[in-house]
Amino acid sequence: MKSTLIILRGNSASGKTTIAKELQEHFGQGTLLVSQDVVRRDMLKVHDTIGNLSHDLLFEITKYGKGKCEFVILEGILSSRRYGDMLKELIHFFDENTFTY
């Protein structure tokens, strides 16, 4: 299965999560939604600092969707300083089959 990665980035309260959930609903069953806030705040209870535990988990969960899900949506503030290299790796991992916003 060919997987498409959709990355939604932006400021706090800009509508990323709302749009991501709407996209997941639109694409339907098997669409993986990876939310930075859920992983960082709810699952790990860590602050968004350089090197925090959520970085690696976001990366691994997102990679998990390749070949298993038609669409993988990664959403969050995902600042370039903290997550830029990870995002570039994911884009490469998904064979450039990526949309970024």
List PLM regions with ranges.
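Conserved beta-strand scaffold positions in the cores of enzyme catalytic domains, especially
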Residues: 31-33, 96-101
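Conserved glycine(s) of the Walker
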Residues: 15
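Walker A (P-loop) ATP-phosphate-binding motif of ABC ATPase nucleotide-binding domains
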Residues: 5
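The conserved Walker
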Residues: 11-12
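Glycine-rich phosphate-binding loop used to anchor ATP phosphates in small-molecule kinases
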Residues: 50-97
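Hydrophobic anchor at the beta1->P-loop junction of P-loop NTPases
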Residues: 8
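Conserved substrate/cofactor phosphate-moiety recognition/catalytic segment
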Residues: 18-70
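Basic/polar N-terminal segments that are highly enriched at the extreme N-terminus
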Residues: 1-2
